[in-house]
Amino acid sequence: MEMFLMENNNTSFFHQPIRVVSPLSLVLILFTTLFFMSHGEKANAIDLSVISNQTGLMFKLAYIPLTQGAVASSKATKKAQDLIFRDLVESGYFDVSIPSNEAVSKLQAISLTGEGTSMLASGGYEGVAAARVTEDGTGTHVLGVVRDPVSGKVLLSREYTTSGAARHAIHRFVDDVIFQFTGLKGIAMAKIAFIGKNPRRGYDLYAMDFDGEGLHRLTFDHVLAYSPAWSLKTHQIAYVSYLHMDPQILVYDLRTGRRTALARFPGLNITPDFSRDGIHLAVALSKGNRSQRTEIYVTTLKDKTFNRLTFSRSNNLSPSWSPSGNQIAFVSDRDGHPQIFVMDSDGTNVHRITYNGFYNVSPAWGPSGDLVAFVCMNDRHRPKICLTTPDGSRSIQITHGRGQDDSPDWSPDGRSIIYSHQVRGKSVIMKMFLDGSHTHRIGTFPRDVITPMWAIP
């Protein structure tokens, strides 16, 4: 959840994608009164063909769901085969299809490592993936193979075993298929944290797999919470909680389930963000009562010494680290309205990068370093997701249509973005490729969700 404070007759206004009320009865509202108007020199649009080239790397892949004996009638095995197909499609790297029934029947009758895939070469396939899923008393076993349809050469042959959910073995196989074709790490094993509304009252911290499965509730506080920041290197999630009435930054340890307070100064302690190395966190603190402005600080989990980076007479919040750790994007109203700025990680070389409109917040720096996602206000005064280059020279709006879009965050491979989407009071997590294609909901969480965040690998 992007929060933005502006002093106006001693009242603080917050941008918030859904209606909630804190224990202290703070008024939380959207900046719907801010118009999306031209302000200063407009940036040039980002070339969509460039974005498409980033996300449009496609390989034509045949998938063969291999069966063996009674396994063919297993509902669990059929579900596992469907998940493999879905994971391959979801990756965005493959144009996946299951060949004709005749071809499948012939290929199912041969050994995984035998000859026979050449019958698919005429179909223009660049690879043939096959998997056999079996279950026994020790767990689920996935034997996955990828072959060249022309030469018949085995490109990948590996068995994946798990004593837990079958999807874990399947996700590992799909990530290996992606690496075999692209040389890039897949995201099938990636995790997403978010804040979810509880059935009766309040919110809590949740985590799930990249596809919305494997949902886990991590906290049971029933209080307002938001802005999770997840570092896999430290196995920790930093987030904002009103557990002790005031907004404090807590750190949840995924290994132990324990929480510690990172920042609990008087006033606001909000919007944490981990650096890629998992060592540093950038946060926004007011260090006083709620009428005080927030400033950006950097700290570490080890010594908890807070180094102040911003010193302007304005609100500064929502820091987002660059992949290199050398720069930080953040929100400031120093020019009168909330805009995105970038500074070096020591607080120097501050410069503004958004100029279109009066409302640009919630920056999220992409893992490749060449794009920053953020929330902009469209011409119908609805928050939408936009992209800009780090120097502000090019920008584009990538979500459209009804509803309000908020809290963008990047997949670890930089090919897609998740965000919260609200229509008619209902907020869900959506995912899309950068070119706007393959937009769909993630998960089936039955209540409102806010501030989704990918785990930083």
Regions found by a protein language model. Give the residues of each.
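C-terminal/domain-edge helix-coil "capping" segments
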Residues: A43-F59, V150-T219
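Hydrophobic beta-strand positions that form the internal "hydrophobic ladder"
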Residues: I192, I237-A238, G278-L281, G325-A329, ...
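Amphipathic beta-strand/beta-sheet edge segments enriched in Tyr/Trp
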Residues: D47, A109-D176
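Short, solvent-exposed, polar/charged sequence segments at loop or secondary-structure edges
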Residues: T67, A72-F85, V89-T140
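A flexible loop/linker signature enriched in serine peptidases of the S9 family
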Residues: K185, G196-D204, H222, V240-I249, ...
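Multi-bladed beta-propeller domains
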Residues: V104, D209-Y226, D253-I270, T299-L317, ...
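Residue-level detector of Asp-centered blade-edge/turn motifs that repeat once per structural unit
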Residues: I187-A188, L232-K233, R276-D277, P323-S324, ...
